[in-house]
A protein has these predicted regions:
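N-terminal low-complexity segments that are often proline-rich with Ser/Thr-Pro
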Residues: 1-36
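A generic structural signal for ordered alpha-helices
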Residues: 3, 106, 166-169
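Residue-level detector of functional hotspots within protein domains
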Residues: 6, 11, 119-122, 174
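Catalytic domains of carbohydrate-active enzymes that cleave complex glycans
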Residues: 17, 26, 35-40, 44-63, ...
């Protein structure tokens, strides 16, 4: 999973009694649950869910490092500024769990507001790869305002926060650059697997070059020349893939 909107789809199958059994379904909680009810009540609710409906998975948007308190949550999506250590991601992945990150209206960089540098959408893909996340969630995809073609503002939210595509199957520069970032992240993932599987000195050297290339993109404080660094990194990535 490289991109997911804030939608969880549960697939169901009919059981022998005519009821509905969830298959790969997840109950999703956003950040407001803990803020509203508190961590202890949140844990009690999750424990009850695990006891009464163990076939359901749990997905959670997390801005308080709650994944440490709820290690059984199948899919955790943390706020971009709350980076999950690589060893925690690896431990969760070993259990078959997914760890992603998200951006929303309070995150300055990287983001995809109407006024954002379009290259930030590409950077989001590189940040995903550099941190080792399984994917990225962007709020939001198509929560359109009253006149989305002419005014992207919504209340006090940054302009363009609530949607990245337009009605009538219209794309946007922001969305197309995000696709570019996703493609880069997928290419990085594929190359890592290929270099590891090859097991040759040349492949090991290329793997090291790729890791060094990524090391400069695991930050969310933009440097003055970040656009140039991104362009150069994309060029080197293409060289490594040849």
């Amino acid at each position: 999973v490289l991109v997911e909107d804030d939608v969880v789809i549960a697939h169901g199958i009919e059981d022998g009694a005519g009821g509905l059994v969830a298959e790969d379904g997840r109950v999703a909680l956003d950040e407001g649950v803990q803020a509203l009810f508190g961590q202890e009540i949140g844990r009690d609710a999750l424990d009850l869910l695990r006891k009464t409906a163990p076939e359901l998975g749990i997905a959670m948007a997390d801005n308080k490092n709650s994944y440490l308190s709820y290690p059984f949550v199948n899919s955790v999506c943390v706020k971009v500024c709350d980076r999950v250590p690589p060893q925690h991601i690896a431990g969760r992945r070993a259990q078959g769990f997914v760890t992603t990150y998200y951006v929303c209206c309070s995150d300055r960089f990287p983001n995809m507001f109407t006024f954002s540098d379009p290259a930030e959408a590409v950077y989001a893909g590189w940040y995903t790869a550099a941190c080792g996340y399984d994917g990225f969630l962007r709020w939001a995809y198509n929560s359109w305002v009253e006149e989305p073609l002419t005014d992207s503002r919504f209340r006090t939210f940054p302009a363009g926060d609530t949607y990245i595509v337009y009605p009538g199957a219209r794309s946007s520069v922001r969305f197309e650059r995000l696709v570019e970032g996703i493609q880069d992240a997928e290419k990085i993932s594929i190359l890592k697997k290929e270099f590891t599987a090859a097991g040759t000195p040349e492949a090991a050297s290329r793997f090291g070059q790729l890791e060094a290339l990524l090391s400069g993109f695991a930050i969310v404080t933009p440097e003055a020349n970040w656009q140039d660094r991104l362009s150069e990194a994309k060029r080197k990535l293409n060289e490594l893939s040849r």
